[in-house]
Amino acid sequence: GKEFVAGTNIKKALKNTKSDYQKGYCFSYDMLGEGARTEKQAQEYLTSYLDALTALKDIDKDKPLLERPNISVKLSALHPRYEYLQQDRVMSELYDRIKQVAMLAQKYGLTISLDAEESYRLDSELELYAKLISDNDFKDFQGIGFVLQAYQKRAIPTIKFLINLAQTFSKKIPIRLVKGAYWDSEIKWAQMEGLSGYPVFTRKSHTDVSFLACSSLLLNNTEYFYPQFATHNALTASAIITLAEKLGKEDAYEFQRLYGMGSSFYDQMIAKRPCRIYSPVGSFRNLLPYLIRRLMENGVNSNFINQLIDDNIEVKELLKNPIEKAEFNIETSRKLLKLPQDIFDGRVNSLGYSLGNKAHMKSLKDRLAQFQNQHYIAGSIINGKVLSGKSLEVRSPYDQNQLVGNIALANYDDLNQALKIASESATDWRRQSVESRAKILENMADLIKESEVEFISLLMREAGKTLNDTIAEIREAIDFCNYYAMQARALSEPEKNQSYTGEDNYLSYHGRGVFACISPWNFPLAIYLGQVVAALVSGNSVLAKPAESTSIIAFKATELLYKAGVPKNVLQFVPADGKLFGEVILSNNIISGVAFTGSTATAHVINRTLAKRDSPIAKLIAETGGQNCMIVDSSALLEQATDDIINSSFLSSGQRCSALRVLYVQDEIADDLTELIKGAMAELQVSDPNLFATDLGPVINQQAQDNLNNHIKLMKKKAKFIANVKIQGSKTGFFVE
């Protein structure tokens, strides 16, 4: 750790960097930390930045502002919710903290730089930075710097945005240009979130070209910028020196290197050109994430230093024009790293949303508005006809005063009619080619994407889901359609098995007949469709019974299935009372199989009902509840463990079988982890799921609310109460505190 960290505190760092200071280096000090999870941590980081500025106030007091020490500020360390969905809090709470740091820097004649982090935070950072630059309290201060990552595809547009900012407010912005240190995370995040492309360049040569392009733009605009080029690549540094000399800007920039790295190169240059050392400061407890990034960055084969000492790589290869390398790599880039939508062989990865993109979020909010007050009329769909009858009001679980629509449940006669039609259509549907059935599922996937804004609205209004949960569920529904289409094709051809001489044995798969699909309310779109499309593509006709609490969502999905090409006599939509459905449908000998997601107790009832019949054995596919546990030992990074615990516990308001129920923690870390969890819970917002900033919505209904409140009362008597999340939502909703 001592190799890469200047000291455990700012005073030790000043002592340890004294020899480099005497060589002529300037310094930028970074308070190590990977981002606050709690308000307490944020305040501690704020104090560390203020203390560091105070410790530096008397160093090089007579030198110009940009030659004095600098503090690098990690915005995520100053606020536990530094993300665009929490932008209102960012622009008030986080802004007040970074302004406090900037005011002290201005008082002492020092500079600060806002460190670059993950790409999903960029829009939020730019908005915050613009507010800082335009603040009248900094009218005459030129010491608020910005860090730009060259691997970001938005690097050039960001520079142009900053030029406009500098022009408007008469600023000269110190701008540190780096390659970028979160590449692996950016790639994985883009794949998991289903982005249309990667926010960063995927080839090192492309990042190298971007770095040079950004360098050129910065050097051509030194009236607005003081460029600070952070590189250990000798070829890149040489190109910058040459370009600066051509432009007559030899004294208009500086280089930067990391503490513990690049000394042999920059020690040769320091007499001619200014160089600043980026110097991490902090305890070894906070070192690991930073150290891993450095090791990953410098351990790869494409690293300049590694290539320089590799006897198998000729020097002329290192000196090759990076533009030529980039052009050569254009064709191979996508082959080596597929786009997020193409990472799965045989099917596409569903598209998601970049929730940190300001334009995307504004567009989504505007489009959602058209569905906010829509009233839905739904009912059973038998042989393609929507049946009317006595209907139930469907009210939103977050506000019982809001009417979502009405649903007419199927009665005894409706269920018998649906069963008859499904039975009559089963043989013809089974004879349809697998390819034609699979194509219908892929059509359905496309139709869901086209209707996703309405589904987001419905999932919020009828199921009480937050924005993150709705997007995840819609993507899961799309993935189900594409996945089962792929699997059906893979299993469509008979498979020849080993056999005796003169004998041929084949294994082939066929539809069984009529399937009953019984889905839950906690995933009213994804699981409903997952059950139904799997049964359909396998050649079965289907009776689909959704949960009564979320039947409108299933109704809209069923309408899309017909539009996608499912014959109206093959799929019957029958929202019904559970007991009645069991008596009429599940006890009937026509039923060949049941797909069920719900409680273990109900699964046992279904199993017994099927077993009592005097008919061929029906298949029961049951997905039931359980106790999900997590074990955390002392090897875990507690901040990361806290993130996982919060997500597992509270996504979908904890209403999923995979939600964390029991946490086992090693004694030695239990107190520290408990404090982190308490602090992270205090930052969660329990409110109206229509608000993008909401983290937890309501539970589904009054019964669920009562059950949870009763359990909380019981546990408060039997166990030690640690923390709960405060409600900010409507008093007429089913919220749990």
Q: What are these model-derived regions, one by one?
A:
Residues N401, A422, R437, L459, ...:
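Residue-level signal for inorganic ion chemistry
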Residues K563-G565, S587-N589, G593, T600-E737:
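ALDH superfamily catalytic-core signature
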Residues Y21, L53, K57-D60, I133-N136, ...:
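Structural signal for hydrophobic packing residues in well-ordered secondary-structure cores
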Residues E3-K11, K15, Y21-F27, R37, ...:
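Catalytic cores of nucleotide-enabled group-transfer and carboxylate-activating enzymes in metabolic
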Residues V281-G282, N286-P289, R293-K420, E424, ...:
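Terminal low-complexity tails and localization/encapsulation signals of metabolic enzymes
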Residues G1-L351:
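Positively charged, amphipathic and often flexible ligand-engagement surfaces
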Residues D30-L32, K74-S76, S113-E117, V147-Q149, ...:
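Generic beta-strand/beta-sheet core signal
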Residues M460, A488-Q640:
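Rossmann-like NAD(P) dinucleotide-binding subdomain of oxidoreductase/dehydrogenase enzymes
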